[in-house]
Every structure is written in C-alpha cells, then in structure tokens.
C-alpha cells in the first residue's frame, strides 16, 4: 500500500487509480475545492503526506497549482497527456493502470526555491524550444523525467523546482533519442 494519500479530481479517477495501486484517495471534486475536501486533504497531508495526481489538462494544472500553494511539501505525479487521452477527453480515468503506476513511481517534490540548474539555453541546445516539434519533445522528455508537460517557460520552471539533476536531464535526453529519433 502506498503510504501517502493520493489526491485526484473525481470519482472516475479514484476508480482508475485503485485498478493500478493499493492506496487511499481523495477526490477534489473539481477546482471549487469545498472546505470539507480541503480539511480532508489537510488531515491526510499532516498525517501521511499526499501525492497530487491531477489530469494533464488546463483545469488539472490549475488544481495542482492551487493545492501546491496550500500543501507545499506535497509530492507530485504526472501521467502524460498522450497516455491519459481518448478522442475527446483527457483525464486520469483514461490512463491505463500501467501509466498510473509509472507516474507514481516517479513522484517528485516541488521545491519552493529554484535550483537555477537549468536555463533557457539548455532548452534551445536540446531542441526543446525554437525547433520543429519542440512541443512534442518537451512532452516526451517531461514524461521520462516524471514532471509533466509545459510550455518552454513552464518546463524550465519544473526542471528547476522539481530538483532535476544534470545526470537525470542527460539520461532523459538520451532515452528520448533512443526511443524517438531513430524511427
């Protein structure tokens, strides 16, 4: 059983995560976050810790951001959008149990202080911005690192605030090259 309580958006997400792992879960019920839900999350955070696993879409990122402010030592897990999408829907409920397990294997803490390890130049030099398919490459490298997707500025912030090391960065770029560039 996972020690921390996993925070997701809805009941369908709870059902999907339960297919993947043995864990206690709390659903936010969307962005509105009722006070009773916040109290439940706070109790879990203080007693066992929480893992935020929201949908890889705009509303999910807003919920994650809001929870990150309230619970700064929460852990974060990201299922890539490509693994949580159907034709017309994006959400954890669409992810395979294996995708959920992979995301939970790569949980990260969001450090309030930036490491300043990475700079926009690193993204340029790695073709993660300003290049053909930079968007797709950022999504793939973000999935490998377990930090999710973001535009170039958001991605750079995640690299620095999730404590990614140069070794992890180089390993992720190499893995990307092995998987995608030799097709």
Report the location of each language-model feature.
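Short, ordered loop/turn segments at secondary-structure junctions
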Residues: 11-12, 29-31, 55-57, 79-84
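Acidic, glycine-rich catalytic loops of TOPRIM or P-loop NTPase phosphate-binding modules used
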Residues: 4, 11-47
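Long, charge-dense
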Residues: 66-113
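Hydrophobic anchor at the start of a short beta-strand
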Residues: 24-25, 50, 74-75
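C-terminal, charge/polar-rich interaction regions
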Residues: 102, 111, 116-183
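Short, basic, helix/turn surface patches
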Residues: 50-62, 102-110
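Acidic beta-strand-to-loop metal/phosphate-binding motif
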Residues: 7-9, 47-59, 78
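Phosphate- and divalent-cation-binding pockets in alpha/beta enzyme and binding domains
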Residues: 16, 62-66
């Amino acid at each position: 059983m996972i020690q921390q309580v996993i925070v997701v958006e809805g009941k369908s997400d709870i059902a999907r995560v339960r297919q993947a792992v043995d864990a206690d879960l709390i659903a936010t019920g969307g962005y509105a976050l009722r006070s009773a839900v916040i109290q439940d999350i706070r109790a879990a955070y203080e007693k066992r810790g929480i893992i935020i696993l929201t949908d890889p879409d705009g509303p999910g990122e807003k919920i994650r951001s809001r929870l990150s402010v309230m619970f700064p030592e929460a852990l974060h897990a990201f299922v890539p959008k490509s693994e949580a999408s159907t034709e017309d829907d994006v959400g954890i409920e669409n992810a395979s149990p294996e995708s959920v397990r992979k995301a939970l294997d790569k949980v990260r803490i969001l450090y309030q202080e930036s490491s300043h390890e990475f700079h926009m130049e690193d993204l340029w030099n790695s073709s993660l911005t300003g290049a053909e398919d930079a968007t797709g490459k950022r999504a793939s490298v973000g999935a490998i690192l377990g930090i999710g997707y973001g535009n170039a500025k958001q991605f750079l912030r995640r690299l620095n605030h999730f404590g990614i090391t140069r070794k992890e960065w180089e390993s992720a770029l190499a893995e990307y090259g092995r998987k995608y560039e030799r097709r």
